[in-house]
């Protein structure tokens, strides 16, 4: 959901594009009519109010994972007026936040390969890779690996705790002595 944490009424809109990979540089394409719907189109919230947008996937029920870039934009309803040295200036501050919406495959197939310091996702849905620095119990490195992608581990020759997390499964890749 969104929360208006300003002192003024704000308008919130949402826009949605399909992306080929769930990353910042993912190539955007228009969504086929009716594949993903959301409600409402926009919200107007007073100071301190919160509300949510709902997303509905009505596209194909197949074995392909899909990614959508969701952009939430906050726009003030009135421009701020600043008077300085006898001049009136109006300004707007528009804030946007982006997130990735993931639609998992209808039938999920989890599979991976780990060899020579490379973790590969050979299934059809994403999983999370986590690792520690050395043999610490603090897992300070984490990456989501989408289907067909691979991750080359920078310090593969060094001892570390490395694992894959998928659903409620934890799969150790390397352990510490």
Task: Outline where the language-model segments fall.
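N-terminal secretory signal peptides
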Residues: 1-4, 11, 60-63
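Beta-sheet-dominated interaction scaffolds and their linkers
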Residues: 1-6, 42, 106-113, 142-144
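Asparagine-centered strand-capping/turn motif at beta-strand->loop junctions
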Residues: 1-6, 57, 117-125, 131
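Short acidic, flexible loop segments centered on an aromatic residue
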Residues: 6-31, 73, 124-139
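Envelope-exposed proteins and targeting segments
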Residues: 10, 51, 66-68, 97, ...
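Solvent-exposed coil/turn segments that connect beta secondary-structure elements
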Residues: 17-19, 50, 56-60, 73-75, ...
